[in-house]
């Protein structure tokens, strides 16, 4: 996979606007069309957890609610991964939509997030570290079951959150296949086929193993909205917009907007080339 750093995106746009004005209109026309059915996938972790945790994994509950308010007030539907995937499969007009995802399975996803999902008529996908179920600060069987019954997704974040690109491939079966098995067994044969790579780290070998063990879709830490074409052709590399706890409201809005442009460049202009 080729990675294109953000500075090259800026250079590309500058060249497009300044040196090739004739190409600008088709570009922006295509971008406008892309936006109609592109969906940013938002990545969260803890909501309202310990202030000692880094901003990458925690956001204050009141900040999270302001983000939901912004999305609701601006006409966004807030979906789970399954709802987005089904919408793309069935040719649904997605309109303005985002997907909400939560990694790790923290208890505050139940105590703080779940009530707000119900308040704003939203759904989400919860990527669970299987070995953490029922441990201190993590959701247990009853909490996860209630989330599922409310229409949210149960998904895998592996057994132990080991970084898959850093471990011996002989352990892939344990981290990937066993996670599916135990989640399915504990939650009434729930169909687990969504994966979040720990720390967003993956490579071609990890993708092949995940598909071998029955995962149909996986989310990464690479920015950019996704459309039907991307999800169909790159189901194991669905990018997400990482939402950090120290973001201001304007930064959240800007990052959401920027994800459409990054997704368009990735999906339409650069094809299968990646950047971050």
Predicted regions and their residues:
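Short beta-strand and adjacent tight-turn residues that come in two discontinuous sequence segments
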Residues: 127, 157, 218-220
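C-terminal active-site subregion of NodB/CE4 polysaccharide deacetylases
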Residues: 2-6, 21-101, 107-108, 166-276
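Short, glycine/acidic-enriched loop or turn micro-motifs at the edges of active sites
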Residues: 106-107, 160
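Sec-dependent N-terminal signal peptides
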Residues: 9-16
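Acidic (Asp/Glu)-rich catalytic clusters
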Residues: 114-121, 139-155, 229-231
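Juxtamembrane helix-loop-helix connectors linking adjacent transmembrane helices
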Residues: 123-132
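Core nucleotidyl-transferase/polymerase catalytic module
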Residues: 136
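Histidine/lysine/aspartate-rich catalytic loop segments that bind and position anionic ligands
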Residues: 132-133, 141-144, 148-169
